[in-house]
Amino acid sequence: WQLRVAAFNVDPESNGNSSRAWKLSPKHTTGTVVPIELVYKQAGTLPREYNLGYYYDSSDAKRIGSNEKVSGRGGHYLLIDQAVWASSASAGRVLHAFGQYSAASEAASPFSKWYGAGMVLYKPLEGRPRDTLALGYGRAVQNPRSRDVQELAAFNAGADYPNLSNAEQLIELSYGYQATPW
């Protein structure tokens, strides 16, 4: 078991500013993000790792659908990575299943929930011990407040309701090719 705690300055004006990349002093701090994470990790033939976390952000953000600010936003998440099969004929060929869930404050987040699941096969080919083959699914659920604001804006403008779905979804198939061992 592990307990991980950290604190990070929130500095939206400096994000992406390469001239501030190596400066440790914050310039435009708006608050602090504090993540707290409990980790269970077990090695063995079928290793696994489970992460349960919560975060708190003290910075102010614009409340969805209002000119007011909200502070003290938080969220939580669960990450699961579980080996479900290991080849007895080829050491290192292991199939992992993973799942992800997160929820954020509906006061200011455009997406209120995220789900993800998939499988990763390590060493898919005998001659490629560090390559991976993966299939994953992800779904980001739009915050109902965001939908309401967009629909109200369309109504007030006399326009048709926007064609809004309830979520964004993706399916991804990937092959990870490691050209050289690290």
What are the residue ranges of the model-derived segments?
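Short loop/turn motifs that connect adjacent beta-strands in outer-membrane beta-barrel proteins
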Residues: 1, 40-50, 85-95, 123-132, ...
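Aromatic- and glycine-enriched pocket-lining scaffold segments that form the walls
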Residues: 1-37
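Transmembrane beta-barrel strands of outer-membrane/channel proteins
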Residues: 3-9, 50-56, 95-103, 117, ...
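Outer-membrane beta-barrel translocator domains and adjoining extracellular loop/strand segments
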Residues: 15-22, 61-67, 108-113, 144-152
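Extracellular loop and loop/strand-boundary signature of outer-membrane beta-barrel proteins
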Residues: 19-26, 65-68, 102-106, 156-161
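Residues that define the transmembrane beta-barrel architecture of outer-membrane proteins
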Residues: 28-34, 72-78, 111-115, 165-171
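Residues on the lipid-exposed face of transmembrane beta-strands in outer-membrane beta-barrel proteins
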Residues: 36-40, 78-82, 117-123, 173-177
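Outer-membrane beta-barrel transmembrane domain signature
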Residues: 110, 127-181
